[in-house]
Amino acid sequence: MSKNQLPSYQVVADEMKMATLAVTPAELHGLLAGMISGGLSQQDQSWQPMLFDYTNDGMGWPSAALEQAQALFNVTSAQLTSDEMVLNLLLPNAEGEEAIFALADALSDWVNHYISGLGLAGAALNKASEEAKEALADLEEMARLGVDEDDDLQEQAELLEQVIEHVKACALLIHAEFGAKTSSSETPTIH
C-alpha cells in the first residue's frame, strides 16, 4: 500500500471481524477522517484512546487491527493534508443490484462517523465559517439519504456517485478550516 492509497474495504472488514470489533471499514474511516479534520494532532497517538473509547468501550484493539487502523490513519492524514485536494472514501465496491444499497448504507455510516469524529476532536463547529456550516449541514442531510428500490437503480447509482463527490468536497472544506496545520506551512513573514 502506497502512502496515499487506502487498503481494500474487504481487507479492513476481515481484520475488524477477526478482532471481533463492531465497526465497519466505512465507520472507521469516517471516524478517523473526522478526527483529523476536527484538528486532532497527527504527530502523536492521541487518536487511539478516542478510537478505543468510541468503538470498544475503552478497551485497546488487537495489534493487527490497530496496525490496520494506523495505516488507515496515515493514508487519510496524508490525503487530507496534501496539496492535491484528493480524498478517497473507504467504501465497498461490490457488483450487482444489491451493491448500490450496500454503498448507500456505507456512505451514510461514513458521514455519520465523520461528524462524530469532528466532535471527538473538539472542533469548534459553532465558530465555523458560513461555508463550513453549510458543508456540515450538507453532510448531515446526505447521511439521511437512501436508495429507493422502486426507482431506476442505474439513475440512483449515478446520483449516489455525485453525492460521494460532494461528501469529499465537504470533508476537504471542513478540514481546511479545522484541521491541524502542519508546521512546514507556517513560514514567518519577513518585513
Curated annotation (Swiss-Prot):
Kindly name one Pfam family recorded for this protein.
Answer: UPF0149
Where would one find coiled-coil regions in this protein?
none
Q: Which SUPFAM superfamilies match?
A: YgfB-like
One GO cellular component from the entry?
Answer: cytosol
Query: Which Gene3D superfamilies did the record assign?
Result: YgfB uncharacterised protein family UPF0149, PF03695
InterPro entries from the entry?
YgfB-like, YgfB-like_sf
The Swiss-Prot or TrEMBL record describes its family as follows:
Belongs to the UPF0149 family.
Q: Which PANTHER family match?
A: UPF0149 PROTEIN YGFB
What's this protein's name?
Answer: UPF0149 protein VV2847
Species this chain originates from: Vibrio vulnificus (strain YJ016)
